[in-house]
Amino acid sequence: MTLRHALFISLVFISTACFGAETKKSSPEDFIRALYRFHQPGKDTPDWFADKQTLSKYFDKELTALFIKNYECEKREQGVGNLDFDPIYDAQDFEKETTNLRIAPAPDEPDLFNVTFTNLGTRTLVYRLTNTPSGWRISDIKYPEELSPKGNIVT
C-alpha cells in the first residue's frame, strides 16, 4: 500500500466519523441549535415547510405529514392554512437576528427541552424530541398561549 492510499483511506474514515457523528450522534441540544442556525426567517431564506425531504430532517413522520397537509391546505385556500405563524418561533414577524438561544432539559422529562430565545421579545417553547435511527426529531412543540403545531393543523 502506498502512502497515498493510506492517506486517502484515513481521510475517508475521518470524514465519515466527523460528518456521521454530527447528524446521528448529536445531543438533543446540538440538534435544536442546528435547527435555529438553519431556520432564520428574519433573513431571506426559502420557505421549507412544504419540502418533505427538509422537514423530515427535523420533524418526526407524523409532524412532517401534518406540515405537508397544512401546505396543501394553503395551496387550496390560496395562502390561508391552519398554521398562521412560524412554528419554530411562535411568531409571524421577526428581527434579522435571534439572540440568547438557551436550551435546557425539562426536569424529570427526558424527552422535553425548554428552548428560550430573543427575537421581537423573549419566548420559551417546549420541544418534545424523539431519538430515531436517523437521529433526533421534533415530535411536538408547546407554545405558551397556543396549541402545538399538531393541535393547530389538525383542528
Stretches with model-predicted labels:
Residues 1-7:
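Bacterial N-terminal signal peptides that target proteins for export
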Residues 26-44:
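Short, aromatic-enriched amphipathic alpha-helices that serve as compact interaction elements
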Residues 27-31, 51, 153:
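Stable alpha-helical elements in mature extracytoplasmic
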